[in-house]
Amino acid sequence: MLGFNGFPKSISTSVNNVACHGLPDERPLEDGDMVSVDVTVYKNGFHGVCTATYVIGNAKDNPLVRYLRSVAEECLYKGEPHFNPSIIGIEI
């Protein structure tokens, strides 16, 4: 993301209620936090991104966390067949 529309970082971290592209800061992660990490690359005029979401501590036992993760996984599997090199992700 570094430089894309003025974004100041190559890695973004979205903690809890931050939807996406949060800026890393000094706040320590706490038990129960959900954090998504986006790592981006810019090469030959194209931006690529890889994202992973992690649950910190015992939140894996939290029903809301399990539900959010299952819905996100379902969306991934439903959208995945529609991706190809000619499609822009926002179109899906």
Language model features with spans:
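Active-site neighborhoods and metal-handling regions in enzymes and metal-associated proteins
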Residues: 1-92
